[in-house]
Structures are given as C-alpha cells and as structure tokens.
C-alpha cells in the first residue's frame, strides 16, 4: 500500500469512531429521558383490577371517610380542611357540584389517613361551619347500579304487573310460563285490572241482563219484550193492521 492509501484508511477509521461515539451519546441521552419520564427508572404499566379488588379498595377507603352535609354554597375546601384539621391528617376532600348548572349540591366527602381520625371527626356532628350546622356521618359505600328505592318500587310494579305483591318474575329457563290467576279475577281480564278491588264478572249469557231468545214470528217477539223504561217497539205489520181497521170503522 502506498502512503496516500494508508492516510485515507486512517481518516476513515477516525470518522467511524467519532460517529460511533456520537451514537452512544445519543443512546445514553435517550435512556436518561425515558428514566425521567418513568418512576424509579422503569416505566410502570397500569394493571386492570377485577370487580372484587375494586370493591375491596372502595371498602377500605370508605372505612376512613365521612359524609359532610348541609354545607353552604360559598364554603371552600380550605375552610373544610381548617374545620377538621384537629381530627387528623386529611388525604382528600371532595365537594359535589351539579353537572348542568355548576352550583354546589351542599354536601361532600372527606377521606382521612386512618379510621381513628374518622371517629374523631364524627364527634363534630352538629357543629357550625360559617354559621350553619353541618351533618357528619360515615360514608356509605356506593354500589354501581343499585337503587335504594328499588325494593319499594319493585313491589308496586309487581303488584300492578302480576297482581301479586311479592311474586317473582318468570324464569326464562322454564318457558312457557303463565302466572296463575288470582281467585277474584277472571281469565278475560288484563293483569292489574283488579288493583282497585273492582270485580268484573266474566262474559257469559247468565250474567247479562239481556239474553238471546229465538222467536218464530214478529208477533211473538213483541209479546216478550223485557220490562224497561223504554217505549215498546211497534212492528211495521201492526201499524198496517191498525190503519186498515180505522178505515173499515169509518
């Protein structure tokens, strides 16, 4: 190899080494940025909890929380914190607002660090906050999809629908299913027609005031007219006979 070729080879090696160093520096900088974004140098992925685990966490948080009602609209979370700061360390304060108007609903929740702090806060029930007595009680665990008026409303609905106060809905596994009729209701009635203690007799000829009768002629039908306040029906044949008799008498 000539001297010129050796010089060119050295120059290419130097450029390759410098490029590798630059790439290493860039990789180190990227690693540092990722480490700053994550906690403890490793990115954490949020794990989905099951319903039982979520309910357990909710019960544990509610065991340290209280409900505060009858709050004036101008109360701020800082004022609530000052009112309950002697009870213990407060972890979270939640005030509820109307989603449509944005006005305060007049109640909220306070979560403490320990259940012992909650017991101290319950002793402040009936105290005054900005000149108004507040109501303090334990926080009730919220169950999604549960309505506290369900039991009372369900009884009225079943009574109207099935005419029984505590009758269960039909099981789809045992279809066809037909609920039994009550003793004072006929099969011709709709369900719920009997809810006002009104009894309607079934449609049969015995219970109707007018019964079907068959006559051989029109004269027989006029003799067997039922006794009502209406005027008796006069057949056309009788009118013709009465007019002919009057003419003959004249």
Swiss-Prot record:
Chain spans, region Disordered: 1-27, 178-250
Localization annotation: Cytoplasm
InterPro entries: Nucleotide-bd_a/b_plait_sf (IPR012677), RBD_domain_sf (IPR035979), RRM_dom (IPR000504)
Domain of life the protein comes from: Eukaryota
DNA-binding among keywords: no
GO cellular component terms given for this protein: cytoplasm
Domain RRM: 64-141
GO molecular function: poly(A) binding
Protein's GO biological process: mRNA metabolic process
Signal peptide extent: none
Polar residues composition bias: residue spans: 191-208
Pfam family name, one: RRM_1
UniProt keyword list: Cytoplasm, RNA-binding
Note: Present with 6490 molecules/cell in log phase SD medium.
Described purpose of this protein according to its UniProt entry: mRNA-binding protein that may play a role in modulating the expression of cytoplasmic mRNA.
Name of this chain's protein: RNA-binding protein SGN1
Protein source organism: Saccharomyces cerevisiae (strain ATCC 204508 / S288c)
Lineage, opening ranks: Eukaryota, Fungi, Dikarya, Ascomycota, Saccharomycotina
Gene giving rise to this polypeptide: SGN1
């Amino acid at each position: 190899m000539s001297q010129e070729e050796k010089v060119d080879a050295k120059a290419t090696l130097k450029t390759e080494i410098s490029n590798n160093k630059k790439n290493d520096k860039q990789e180190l900088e990227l690693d540092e940025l990722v480490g700053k974004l994550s906690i403890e140098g490793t990115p954490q992925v949020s794990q989905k909890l099951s319903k039982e685990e979520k309910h357990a966490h909710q019960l544990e948080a509610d065991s340290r929380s209280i409900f505060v009602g009858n709050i004036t609209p101008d109360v701020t979370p800082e004022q609530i914190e000052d009112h309950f700061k002697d009870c213990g360390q407060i972890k979270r304060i939640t005030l509820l607002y109307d989603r449509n108007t944005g006005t305060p609903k007049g109640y909220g929740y306070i979560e403490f660090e320990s259940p012992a702090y909650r017991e101290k806060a319950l002793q402040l029930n009936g105290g005054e906050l900005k000149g108004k007595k507040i109501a303090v009680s334990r926080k009730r665990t919220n169950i999604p999809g549960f309505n506290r008026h369900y039991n009372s409303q369900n009884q009225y609905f079943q009574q109207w629908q099935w005419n029984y106060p505590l009758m269960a809905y039909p099981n789809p596994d045992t279809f066809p299913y037909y609920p039994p009729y009550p003793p004072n209701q006929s099969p011709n009635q709709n369900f719920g027609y009997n809810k006002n203690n009104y009894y309607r007799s079934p449609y049969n000829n015995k219970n109707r005031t007018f019964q079907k009768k068959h006559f051989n002629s029109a004269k027989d039908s006029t003799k067997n007219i039922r006794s009502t306040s209406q005027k008796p029906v006069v057949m056309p044949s009788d009118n013709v006979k009465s007019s002919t008799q009057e003419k003959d008498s004249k």
